[in-house]
Amino acid sequence: MAIDPNSKPRLAPGCRFGENNNQRVLLMPERALRLNGPSLEIVSRCDGTRTVAQIVHELQKLYAKAEPARVEQDVLGYLGLLSDQRALDFQ
């Protein structure tokens, strides 16, 4: 699935943040996904107010030492993975 840079991702119904052994996790109806580093930075921005392009830009600034194209590729790939797992909705 191609992700529209103008779409606004948010957690899908039934998905929420939680903690397990002092580790942030994304709780989904059938499983939990451990979040750390970049994955936590990406998911925490999926609040339905930021566009995909804004999220990419924020992460490019946060990881300024990394190649911007690589950051964009990683963000889009992770959003696609979460979409495939039905953890995100896009407005």
Predicted segments — roles?
Residues 1-28:
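Long, low-complexity, charged/polar intrinsically disordered regions in eukaryotic proteins
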